[in-house]
Amino acid sequence: MSDAEKAFIIADLDRHGPLTLCDSCYRDIPYRRTDPISLELTDESRSCSVCMVRTSKPEAFTEPFCTFLRENPTVFHAVGYFTSKLTSLGYKELPAREDWTGKLEPGGKYFVTRNGTSIIAFTVGKAYKPGNGVAMIAGHIDALTARLKPVSNKPTSAGFLQLGVAPYAGALNETWWDRDLSIGGRVIVRDESGKTSSKLVKLDWPIARIPTLAPHFGVGMLGQNNKETEAVPIIGLDNSDLGSSGAKPVETLGPAGSFVNTQPPRLVQLISKELGIKDYSQIVNWELELFDLQPATVGGLDKEFIFAGRIDDKLCSWAAFQGFLASEANEDDGAIKLVALFDDEEIGSLLRQGARGNFLPSTIERAVESLSVKDNKAFGPGVVGQTYANSFLVSADVTHSVNPNFLSRYLDNHAPRLNVGICLCADSNGHMTTDSVSTAILTRVCELSGCTPQVFQIRNDSRSGGTVGPMLSSAMGVKAADAGLPQLSMHSIRATTGSLDPGLGVKFFKGFLDKWEKVDAEWQ
């Protein structure tokens, strides 16, 4: 695969138009195998869409990131996107339930998923030897949302159909009121033969809204409302009770005990139609959630911003993934390059697909075991310990951009700006992994990669958030640092980042994976 073709696939350039190409890339890219696109030819590589991606120009990644946000609203869709991208680039999936012995080799490209909501991808250096280190980036792809309850059907209230939902992490806060909410997620289906499968679904129009109460009623709407009784989404109308006598019969869509009988009938019918399901009882269960439908967009006088939902943390996870895909593969690479994107960070990471589970260490250890067998080297605790001692983790999570309306909330010289670069994040109480050694390592990476690092630490009178870094670095004993991209309005249903920040992230994460072995050698 040529570098031009790789860049074309990485950034989804077949989805955008018009596509400006230099003559060289026009000959190399596989555009003839994609959907029709509008092409503009240029003699200058600096304006060629593919060349801009190949050279990590930040502006080349703005629209691809916005498209990713628009098309992948749930964690299930995000993992599906990453899986599709890896497969198209020749990565081999490693089923967790199978034996990996003999399946891995130096120069190989692999990925493994867990629960359809977490994914780990890695490449093995062509010069890899058992005991060599892993250059890894870890982040999370879950975001604040409102998930349907196990029984989401609710009695009609004053003619309104409502939906039973529960907040995931800090969702249903005041920013969720009066928003156009759609629905998506995973549906478990059993067909006529008894085979069970998982199907992804999302609707492209709003089906729900949480209405505020007008100020005329004298009740404030400043976030002090009851999330169980006052933040219940409305999804339709049913005024059939007007003028009727007696109770309305309960509508059922399946046999007694069917899952679909616990959900709003009209929603079941709608989801079934989207998935082409005729027999509603084939729906065994589902994990659906609400999301803000307003699309990600660029804004500002010179389009300096991205306004979008779910920036925390699709931003760092997408940039890390793209940086990983764009990283170089040289003959003398001796390390494993890896990106791990987890679910459940916003609620503590304690589930098996979260960073506190064994997903990352077990994947690394199984990979090292397979590679040791390939190299005829005995595998055991010694090789595992040596691997971790030679490794480094970048914990990638969004951090707080300085807010011009609240400057006093930030420490001097610790106030990151948008469209500048990656932030090295510190915390004296161990909520971040960064120390003097890891800071020096990443600062050197920035120097070699042409990146501008920023620094963030929260004030002593404010509460620091946490990341997956401490739990992963302590579990494996690896050196680590926290580094993330800045955003405004964290944990709002709609946030802001810089239009160059996705691309600046790609440049940094690619630089870390490409330069880490060189930097690590300077410490030996």
List the predicted regions and their residue ranges.
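N-terminal hydrophobic/helix-forming segments and targeting peptides
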Residues: 2-26, 40, 44-524
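Short, non-ligating residues that shape and space the ligands of small metal-coordination modules
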Residues: 31-32
